[in-house]
């Protein structure tokens, strides 16, 4: 359900040829159905049972613009060298939790999430026949707990956001099922600090 603009994959291979040692996570702008409007990244905000809201960096409106760092974005398209792949948590199940998580995992490994303005992709959001993969609220919450705990991020925002759909006892139970006894996991460094310090 992903389509690329003509020539994009050739440009991506050329980028790797020109940057053979890169261990960054490479992503690109989402192109909407009008084939003009783009979104380049997610703002780190909770909304509608998801972490991350689409946003646009004006620099990427020029396909030939220089690559730039992003904090997080959707995972419809991402690329890296095989030896640079940091992996998803094997406890993830169903839909949700990967966006923001995988970019942060690259940063904690000393690398970056990069937007390549030419790497444009069109995503079919509509599902006329419904999703063909597990899509449950409980899976989403568990995945967020698993990912945040693995990366030593604070889980309190998960409790706060999902309190609209689940009780404190239900969330504690999901936390325990996912990673152990309920507790707040605090992290001493913010994502933006790592973005500025990582190579």
Describe each PLM feature range.
Residues 112, 116-141, 145:
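Catalytic donor/gating beta->alpha subdomain of glycosyltransferases that bind UDP-sugars
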Residues 3-48:
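Conserved donor NDP-sugar-binding/catalytic core segment of glycosyltransferases
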Residues 1-3, 92:
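The conserved acidic donor/metal-binding loop of glycosyltransferases
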Residues 36-63, 191, 197-199:
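Extended repeat-based solenoid scaffolds, especially LRR ectodomains
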Residues 71-75, 87, 133-199:
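Terminal low-complexity segments of carbohydrate-biosynthetic enzymes
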Residues 4-7, 27-28, 88, 115-117, ...:
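Intrinsically disordered, low-complexity regions enriched in proline, serine, glycine
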Residues 72-74, 82-115, 119-122:
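Donor nucleotide-sugar recognition loop
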């Amino acid at each position: 359900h992903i389509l690329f603009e003509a020539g994009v994959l050739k440009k991506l291979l050329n980028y790797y040829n020109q940057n053979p040692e890169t261990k960054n996570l490479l992503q690109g702008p989402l192109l909407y159905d009008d084939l003009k409007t783009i979104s380049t990244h997610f703002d780190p905000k909770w909304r509608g049972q998801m972490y991350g809201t689409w946003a646009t960096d004006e620099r990427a409106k020029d396909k030939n613009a220089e690559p730039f760092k992003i904090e997080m974005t959707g995972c419809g398209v991402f690329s890296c060298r095989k030896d640079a792949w940091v992996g998803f948590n094997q406890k993830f199940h169903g839909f949700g939790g990967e966006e923001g998580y995988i970019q942060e995992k690259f940063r904690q490994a000393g690398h970056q999430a990069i937007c390549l303005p030419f790497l444009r992709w069109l995503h079919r959001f509509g599902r006329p026949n419904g999703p063909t993969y597990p899509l449950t609220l409980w899976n989403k919450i568990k995945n967020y707990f698993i990912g945040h705990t693995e990366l030593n991020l604070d889980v309190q925002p998960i409790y706060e956001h999902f309190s609209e759909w689940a009780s404190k006892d239900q969330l504690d139970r999901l936390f325990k099922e996912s990673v152990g006894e309920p507790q707040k996991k605090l992290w001493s460094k913010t994502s933006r600090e790592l973005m500025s310090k990582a190579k």
